[in-house]
Amino acid sequence: MTDNPLLSSASQIEDQDAALRPKTLAEFVGQAGAKDNLQVFIESAKQRREAMDHVLFFGPPGLGKTTLAQIIARELGVNFRATSGPVIAKAGDLAALLTNLEHGDVLFIDEIHRLNPVVEEVLYPAMEDRALDLIIGEGPSARSVRIDLPPFTLIGATTRQGLLQTPLRDRFGIPVRLQFYSVEELERVVARGASLMGIGIDKGGATEIARRSRGTPRVAGRLLRRVRDFAQVAGAEKITQSIADNALTRLEVDKIGLDLQDRRYLTMIADIYKGGPVGVETLAAGLSEPRDTIEEVIEPYLIQLGMIARTARGRCLNDRGWQHLGLAPPSGQMPGLFGPDE
């Protein structure tokens, strides 16, 4: 055993992701407006002794959708059941989940936009009427059977709200958009994570990690662990700004959080397509990445920074994108032509 405060015992290392998750709304950092509203809805449901209305969390990945769903179940004092859209292949799979719920339980479906349309049809009466309509048998002998369900709360999570069918989206009484975090909020996330992991960190170190975390708590937690590795091997007693800067530079994460893949994306538009427009399928092929990765992982933060624009003709590099690459737009392109308002 070592006295180095950066070292953790085996029990501390085990399941660090779960250990770092906040357990209550009071512990949850950021999303102040959404959090305050959820507190009201939870208290109202508890006072009425009813199941809370169905909730839809939407926004970029890594902002706390799953964590908030777990917190809702915990604060309601009910069971938490979790699954994901692609896993529920058949209507029977969903029926098995729903019929095993107890009064007030929370059923969490991640990537709910990827539900099979046939499964969605079964979900509609379950959400609205607390009932399950099933067809038993085939052909002339087939008959419809309605099974009553206990009151429950469905919580859906999606990074692609626009892909949800309107009838499904409209059945969620509590839609909640999650926003990217500010640097100050991420500093608190990093400081809290370091404390829970038994890592010493000063304000400069927390700020450096926060600035490069893409506005996303999940990224902040991942970078914190990697910086801890560098600090530990260097024999440092705590993470400072210089240690964090050195570690993140070696990990090829730049000053505003862009990684190698982000820079490849920007460089491809700038060098090969002269700033765009260029189609997303072309970019996906050039980067050897699926379209979903481009649209859900790479682009949201670049759009948030004002570096690219999604237009009807394709992706275009904005002035800030050119500036970040240290390049000037082609002479034929007017400054600001593809600005954020396009």
Curated annotation (Swiss-Prot):
Instruction: Quote one Gene Ontology molecular function term.
Output: ATP binding
Source organism, top-level taxon: Bacteria
What function does the entry list? The RuvA-RuvB-RuvC complex processes Holliday junction (HJ) DNA during genetic recombination and DNA repair, while the RuvA-RuvB complex plays an important role in the rescue of blocked DNA replication forks via replication fork reversal (RFR). RuvA specifically binds to HJ cruciform DNA, conferring on it an open structure. The RuvB hexamer acts as an ATP-dependent pump, pulling dsDNA into and through the RuvAB complex. RuvB forms 2 homohexamers on either side of HJ DNA bound by 1 or 2 RuvA tetramers; 4 subunits per hexamer contact DNA at a time.
Any idea which positions bind ATP? L20, R21, G62, K65, T66, T67, R171, Y181, R218
> What is its EC class?
hydrolase
Q: Which positions bind DNA? A: R291, R310, R315
* InterPro entries with a match to the protein in the record: AAA+_ATPase, AAA_lid_4, DNA_helicase_Holl-junc_RuvB, P-loop_NTPase, RuvB-like_N, RuvB_C, WH-like_DNA-bd_sf, WH_DNA-bd_sf
Q: What is this protein called?
A: Holliday junction branch migration complex subunit RuvB
Tell me the first and last residues of the signal peptide. none
Binding residues annotated for Mg(2+), in chain numbering:
T66
Q: Name one GO cellular component term.
A: Holliday junction resolvase complex
Give the enzyme's EC designation: 3.6.4.-
Q: Which Pfam families match?
A: AAA_lid_4, RuvB_C, RuvB_N
Q: Which transformation does this protein catalyse, written as a reaction?
A: ATP + H2O = ADP + phosphate + H(+)
Q: Which UniProt keywords apply?
A: ATP-binding, Cytoplasm, DNA damage, DNA recombination, DNA repair, DNA-binding, Hydrolase, Nucleotide-binding
Where are the residues of the annotated region Head domain (RuvB-H)? 255-342
GO biological process assignments: DNA recombination; DNA repair
Q: What is known of its domains?
A: Has 3 domains, the large (RuvB-L) and small ATPase (RuvB-S) domains and the C-terminal head (RuvB-H) domain. The head domain binds DNA, while the ATPase domains jointly bind ATP, ADP or are empty depending on the state of the subunit in the translocation cycle. During a single DNA translocation step the structure of each domain remains the same, but their relative positions change.
Q: Where is this region: Large ATPase domain (RuvB-L)?
A: 2-181
Tell me which species this is from: Novosphingobium aromaticivorans (strain ATCC 700278 / DSM 12444 / CCUG 56034 / CIP 105152 / NBRC 16084 / F199)
Question: Residue ranges of region Small ATPAse domain (RuvB-S)?
Answer: 182-252
Chain's gene name: ruvB
Cysteine pairings via disulfide bonds = none
Q: Which PANTHER family match?
A: HOLLIDAY JUNCTION BRANCH MIGRATION COMPLEX SUBUNIT RUVB, PTHR42848
What residue intervals traverse the membrane?
A: none
